[in-house]
């Protein structure tokens, strides 16, 4: 990952609403969620959610796909894992540590 991409992704996650939305999408898995489902489940107004989803998509952390009349949003696991890899690549000076074990447990 390029440093500019990393900074954009971290900046997107630095907002409490975007972090909450992203974590909900990660937990949902590849099925993703519609904005309506997210707005109801997270108690976020639709217009607020729309703004934050746009920011997450711009950062590369979230993808969107049209399915019939609905937009489906999903966490971009490859991007997320690349970001985690960048943040932890020099962790513990290369020795096995709990961070590496946690990253390996993600089966996305």
What residue spans do the PLM features occupy?
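A generic local structural motif
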Residues: 8, 58-59
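Amphipathic alpha-helical dimerization/coiled-coil segments
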Residues: 1-5, 26-27, 77-108
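N-terminal helix-turn-helix DNA-binding core of bacterial DNA-binding proteins
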Residues: 4-48, 67-79
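Conserved catalytic-core motifs of GNAT/GCN5-like acyltransferases
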Residues: 65-67, 97
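Alpha-helical residues within the helix-turn-helix
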Residues: 40, 57-58
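Short, hydrophobic-biased segments on the C-terminal half of alpha helices
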Residues: 53-54
């Amino acid at each position: 990952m390029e440093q500019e991409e990393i900074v954009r992704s971290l900046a997107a996650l630095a907002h409490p609403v975007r972090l909450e939305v992203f974590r909900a999408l990660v937990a949902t898995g590849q099925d993703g969620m519609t904005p309506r489902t997210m707005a109801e489940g997270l108690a976020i107004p639709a217009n607020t959610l729309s703004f934050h989803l746009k920011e997450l998509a711009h950062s590369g952390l979230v993808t969107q796909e049209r399915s019939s009349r609905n937009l489906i949003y999903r966490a971009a696991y490859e991007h997320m894992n690349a970001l985690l890899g960048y943040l932890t690549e020099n962790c513990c000076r290369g020795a096995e540590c709990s961070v590496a074990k946690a990253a390996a447990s993600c089966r996305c």
